[in-house]
Swiss-Prot record:
Region (Domain III): 153-200
Domain of life: Bacteria
Organism: Trichlorobacter lovleyi (strain ATCC BAA-1151 / DSM 17278 / SZ) (Geobacter lovleyi)
Function recorded in the entry: The RuvA-RuvB-RuvC complex processes Holliday junction (HJ) DNA during genetic recombination and DNA repair, while the RuvA-RuvB complex plays an important role in the rescue of blocked DNA replication forks via replication fork reversal (RFR). RuvA specifically binds to HJ cruciform DNA, conferring on it an open structure. The RuvB hexamer acts as an ATP-dependent pump, pulling dsDNA into and through the RuvAB complex. HJ branch migration allows RuvC to scan DNA until it finds its consensus sequence, where it cleaves and resolves the cruciform DNA.
Region: Flexible linker, residue numbers: 143-153
Family membership: Belongs to the RuvA family.
Protein name (record): Holliday junction branch migration complex subunit RuvA
Domain remarks in the Swiss-Prot or TrEMBL record: Has three domains with a flexible linker between the domains II and III and assumes an 'L' shape. Domain III is highly mobile and contacts RuvB.
Single GO MF annotation: four-way junction DNA binding
Keyword Nucleus attached: no
Domain I, as annotated region: 1-63
Region named Domain II: 64-142
Length: 200
């Protein structure tokens, strides 16, 4: 199984990156936290979780081992697959996730698309003790240094990313209307603003 990849970034989008490793392009699914940390181009190293299904082999990549550990912890829960685990990590940073699990904060957990009250309860029940043992403090804050794009292009990318995370179109349009999208705002900055509003 693939556990680590280092290569040149051939393509980067909010939900995946293509890493060119010695002429072979690997499509790696990533959470927003990893997207924020990756450069637009150049070399990158990702900690990989390989998911083998009947019809596909999918790679999920993370900037830190701790983030990967949280992902693996999430998929150990019945009913949480790799895509939903990635979406959870796209909506809430590991330190906040650990705190929500330890405090039994069902409201915060069930605010994540795809997580209902019963799933939130199951997450707390199964992961409350385990989450505290992971070193969530080693995860970077994720300050984004992104490319500047025309506002229309930024909003299109953000809208697409939010819909991919499970938010409904009317919800996304409402949030995008509230955002402050200055001409110099990057996709990363606008995504962070949108997720803050959606997680209230």
């Amino acid at each position: 199984m693939i556990a680590l990849l280092t290569g040149q970034i051939a393509h980067k989008s909010p939900d995946h990156v293509i890493l060119d490793v010695h002429g072979v392009g690997y499509r790696v699914m990533i959470p927003f936290s990893t997207y924020y940390e990756l450069p637009e181009e150049g070399q990158a190293t990702l900690h990989i979780h390989t998911s083998v299904r009947e019809d596909a082999i999918l790679l999920y990549g993370f900037r830190t081992r701790t983030e990967k550990s949280f992902f693996q912890l999430l998929i150990s829960v019945s009913g949480i697959g790799p895509k939903l685990a990635r979406d959870i990590l796209s909506n809430i940073q590991p330190p906040q996730l650990a705190a929500a699990l330890q405090q039994g904060d069902l409201h915060k957990l069930s605010a994540i698309p795809g997580i209902g009250k019963k799933t939130a309860e199951r997450l707390v029940l199964e992961l409350k003790d385990k989450a505290g043992k992971l070193d969530s403090g080693s995860i970077p804050a994720g300050d984004a240094v992104g490319r500047s794009l025309p506002a229309g292009s930024v909003l299109d990318d953000v809208s697409s990313a939010l819909v991919n995370l499970g938010y409904k179109d009317p919800q996304v349009r409402k949030v995008l209307a509230e955002l402050d999208c200055a001409g110099s705002a990057s996709v990363e900055e606008v995504l962070k603003q949108a997720l803050k509003i959606l997680m209230k």
